[in-house]
Amino acid sequence: MIIFLSIEWNNQKTFGEFDTYTKILNSFFLSVNFRTAGFNSIDLSGLKDSSLFYSTLLMMTGAGQGGTAGGMKITTIAVLIIMVFFVLKQSNQEPHIFKRTIEQKLINKAAAIVMFSSAYVLFVTLLLVETQDYPFVRILFEVVSAFCTVGVSVGDGGILSLSSLFDDFGKSIIIISMIAGRLGVFAFGLLIVGKAKTTHFKYPVGRIII
């Protein structure tokens, strides 16, 4: 909320003409909206690029695990933050919080979600940047909104979404992104790489320098 306020406070295309109360209310609404809702209280085409980029971070993070919103989910990000904290501490303890250990399998799953989601969004964004004549940040916003099933668009300054101005190839990519995001990372990944075969042996540990 504070980030939106600080960036858009004097932007005449968004918050500039509002009084202080309305500015605060709109910044709060935006900070919630980009994580789940898909509504507009202002014309999003007027947002500065820094606000649009911050919005993509909110959309990628998403909402809580029990909700219907898209994104990687708050708990996924939290698990990775806790893991990084313990790695930086070089602790010999397993990652834990609130006196509960976080299973390695759960950490691996969280890392896979973040890696796959980030790689997919980056690949599709670069693909659309090369095929559609629009700025990088705005295309990134459209891709993340589609993949995370948020339902917002930066708009064209009128009544149309930016994605509606893409050619047929660009529109198809956005549609595929929405389907991929709704299926979920693991279901979509399973369609691509297939299910692993069951094995009854274990390889020796490899010592790799990082």
Which stretches of residues belong to each language-model region?
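Membrane-proximal intracellular helices of multi-pass ion channels
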Residues: M1-I210
